[in-house]
């Protein structure tokens, strides 16, 4: 209300975001944090292709708003490289939003930015702790990933829209809920 009433407001120094998935086939947990200038993205399943990238671009495109292979190939190297990174993201990505607002150049290996990386990693871990983000626990991440993989294989093999004939178990191990405690 202070801003509304003409007062001053203390603005945030960081903004955090999370993506886990909209449905089992696009499960791909990511967390990000940005400061005024830099953005860090953590890709928890960098050992596999990003299913959203598969669905929105490339030869197996499932959804219209994405880019076709021909459209991607017609782009310059920076755009093609961005699509390649979208499909096969590294464990972490770091962008200088002042110099590179479109996030083309991943600076994660730039040693001159070690202090920036340390700060963003620390603030992201703090936020994950404050919000009780269970994905930060490797055991929980593995269990949730196995559950998504099982459901995707059994219910979504022939269609991205799949079946709804399954039950999730994640509430039990993420939040300690069970049938009796609903």
Sequence positions of predicted segments:
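Long, internal low-complexity/basic segments
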Residues: 75-92, 97-99, 107-182
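C-terminal cap/loop subdomain of S1 sulfatases and analogous C-terminal strand-loop tails that border
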Residues: 1-93, 171
């Amino acid at each position: 209300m202070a801003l509304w009433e003409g007062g001053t407001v203390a603005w945030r120094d960081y903004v955090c975001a999370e993506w886990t998935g909209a449905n089992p086939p696009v499960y791909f947990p990511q967390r990000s944090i940005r400061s005024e200038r830099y953005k860090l993205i953590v890709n928890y399943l960098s050992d596999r292709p990003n299913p959203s990238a598969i669905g929105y671009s490339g030869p197996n495109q499932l959804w219209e708003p994405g880019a076709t292979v021909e459209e991607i190939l017609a782009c310059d190297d920076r755009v093609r490289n961005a699509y390649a990174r979208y499909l096969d993201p590294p464990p972490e990505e770091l962008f200088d939003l002042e110099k590179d607002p479109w996030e083309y150049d991943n600076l994660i290996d730039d040693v001159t930015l070690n202090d920036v990386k340390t700060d963003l990693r620390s603030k992201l871990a703090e936020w994950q702790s404050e919000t009780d983000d269970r994905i930060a626990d490797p055991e929980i991440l593995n269990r949730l990933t196995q559950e998504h993989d099982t459901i995707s294989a059994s219910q979504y093999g022939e269609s991205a829209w799949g079946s709804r004939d399954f039950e999730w178990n994640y509430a039990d191990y993420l939040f300690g809920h069970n049938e009796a405690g609903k």
